[in-house]
Amino acid sequence: MKYRSRTEIVSEILEVAKGDGVSKTRIMYGAYLSFSQLKEYLSLLLHNGMLSYNKTDKRYRITQKGHEFLRAHQSIEGMLQDKN
C-alpha cells in the first residue's frame, strides 16, 4: 500500500462518515486505519469541527465544515490529475 498523506486520510474518513453516521469500527475499516491512528484522527477532526459525535447512538457524522473540506480536497485533486 502506498504512503497516504494526512489530507488523504482525513478525506477518506470524511467520505466514510457521510450519510446517517458511522461507528468507530466502520471508520477504521473503511479508511484502513489502525485503532491508534483512528483515535488520533477522530480527535483531530472533532477538535476542528469536521466531524460530530452523537453520544446517544454512538455515531460520527460529517459536519458542514467537513463537507467543505471534502469539496476543496476533491477540487485540488482534480487540478492535479494527469490530463493524458
Which residues does each predicted region cover?
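Short alpha-helical segments that sit at the start of domains
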Residues: 1-11
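Short amphipathic alpha-helical interaction segments
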Residues: 32-47
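Short acidic, hydrophobic short linear motifs in intrinsically disordered regions
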Residues: 21-30
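Amphipathic alpha-helical dimerization/coiled-coil segments
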Residues: 75-84
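Basic, amphipathic "hinge/linker" alpha-helix immediately C-terminal to the N-terminal HTH DNA-binding motif
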Residues: 58-73
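A short, conserved structural fragment
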Residues: 46-55
